[in-house]
Amino acid sequence: MKIGVPKEYFIEGIEKGVQKEIDGAIAKLRELGAEIKEVSLPHTEYGLAVYYIIMPAEVSTNLARYDGIRFGHTHGGGADIAMSRSEGFGKESQRRIMLGSFVLSSGFYDAYYRRASLVRELIKDDFKKAFSEVDIIVTPTAPSVAWRIGEKVDDPLKMYLSDVFTVNASLAGLPGLSLPVGYSLPEDGGTTELPVGLQILGSELGEEKVFEVAHVLEQAMKEYVNSKKPSTF
């Protein structure tokens, strides 16, 4: 089994505790007999921008039907469609609908959505090339452990940045999962260690290998992970 580790995913900004647990999980895979190989996904840096253009566009078209007439919440017996949509969607949904409508609007489609779609193909090609060399790719799931409930609700940019390691797999249409491989203290001064996830990615329709690697690693690390689990979990 050849397992790829993309160099672009191990960047400045990963919390030290997260890096330590991820390194430990990769070392365990090597110990279990896997061949660990560095791979390159050169268009990784564009993934977040591309995702947050394409995803809201899909959201806005998908949710357009929820006008309170045939689908969704209805305000005042259907007298006010605008109020039906305002009341029926939360702030984040509204934000994504508005952003998606903007990037699909006349004059901006080519500048944003079309260009993002072209870069998406480059990201797909990066993964295809990498999977011609390895069977599985592993990365951190996120650069940090989870933040406190409600902490970044009013800062969507920071919320979106936490997706930096997972969006490219979605853009490329790849199967993946996040496996807890340890615990780490938040670097913002938290006092409770929180789970660290290892993202395990397979090639297109390669779910079986993803589950296989995840199961073997989970069994091998169960004692270690359980020994670090805080009493509050």
Model-derived segments and their meaning:
Residues 50-56, 153-155, 186-187, 193, ...:
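Short low-complexity, flexible loop/linker segments enriched in glycine and/or proline
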Residues 1-59:
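Gly/Ser-rich, acidic/histidine-flanked active-site/gating loops
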Residues 37-41, 139-140, 176-180:
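Short beta-strand segments at enzyme active-site cores
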Residues 14-15, 48, 109, 147-150, ...:
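Short glycine-/acidic-enriched loop or helix-start segments at secondary-structure transitions
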